Amino acid sequence: SNTALRRYNQWATGHFM
């Protein structure tokens, strides 16, 4: 349902981790 949220999660993981 929230594909955009998953995309953001992947991006945030690479930026914040």
From Swiss-Prot:
Protein name: Ranatensin-R
Tissue specificity statement from the Swiss-Prot or TrEMBL entry: Expressed by the skin glands.
Superkingdom per UniProt: Eukaryota
Classification of source organism: Eukaryota, Metazoa, Chordata, Craniata, Vertebrata
Keyword terms: Amidation, Amphibian defense peptide, Secreted
Family: Belongs to the bombesin/neuromedin-B/ranatensin family.
Record InterPro entries: Bombesin
UniProt source species: Glandirana rugosa
Gene Ontology cellular component list: extracellular region
Keyword Amino-acid biosynthesis in record: no
Membrane in keyword set: no
Methionine amide sites (modified residues): 17
Record localization: Secreted
Pfam families associated with the record: Bombesin
